[in-house]
């Protein structure tokens, strides 16, 4: 008996500097471990509750996702736009997903998805800084790690050469260090059954 979720490793990063505060607790490995114990103790120890994507980062999921362009017009992950099945293109979640995908896609494709180039909007400076800079609290949205954002920005800048939209140009001027690749990332703190691990490698 399996209850399978799709929460990734990135959901474990806390949101408030210096404190273990995570509004995504229900998506974290900590919750997964706690709930598995509860199920075993009080419900049915034959039930396996786990997140299949837990070993992967959200960056790796995005890298895989962009190989399926047929889903670009229909996928959606914006809380504000959920009722209308659109991207509001004005919140931290939209900006985060835009940055993540900008590592792999050109701006023309991204504008078709989001309706505008979010990296060319000066008004998103504060949201941008919260997603990428140490010492800045992350937005209370379901967004990935700052390491993923930095890697995505590094790749996005390389893809675009000298033609950088405002927020990329602003970030490039800080001369950020070259981030570590996540191609081979694998979080071993997971509950994926051994016979399914091969699906993720």
Summary of predicted features, one role per range:
Residues 1-201:
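Nucleotide-activated chemistry modules centered on ATP-dependent adenylation/adenylyltransferase
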